[in-house]
Amino acid sequence: MKHPSATPELVIFDCDGTLVDSEVVAARAWSEYVAGYGVTLSPEDALARFRGVSMKWCISHIEQLHGQPLPAHFEQELRALMGGMLEQHLQPISGAVEIVEQLHVPFALASNAPHHKIELCLRVTGLLPHFAGRIFSAYDVQRWKPDPALFLFAAERLGVAPQRCAVVEDSLPGVQAGLAAGMQVIALQEHGVHPELPAEVAVITHLAQLRAKLG
């Protein structure tokens, strides 16, 4: 694994699966909701298929399984179900609160999710005050990971060159976006390393290990 030669000037965190344990909750919502359309999708399958990808991609996949287009209200109702479940069950990823309280490097958040979902997740987990004014959504640029546009947008808005940024991600699309942006990438792999993870990516298994990787 490669290590940075100098401490980055900006750390850009992903949200889902990196700071908040929302992907497990969202997978349960997917499984429950699509059952009403006659689609069998276990929470485990939803988690494996939908980790780190856009809502548009997920809906397209469900339409293929369903065999016909889904109604216009599908996304709105699904997001409402997810929102309620997140309010009730969402927890921060282990070490997330501590790392944002202790990190001495400026940091931001960049997620494929819309702002309202990001802010919901951060509010429920107590992380929102730490990211005031530094939250970026793929909906801001209309480009979703693995496209690097979101990370480049965040770096530009905060006045930091891409090569001086470090990205912290849990998903392969997020890792690919960070690499394509020319940034250092650190992958949080709590449950085993993804077999397709590029060799140049530094790996941590707990957020407590992040500071050591930042140099």
Language-model segments: which ranges?
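Short, acidic loop-to-helix structural element flanking the phosphoryl-transfer center
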Residues: 84-109, 115-119
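Metal-dependent phosphoesterase signature
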Residues: 60-98
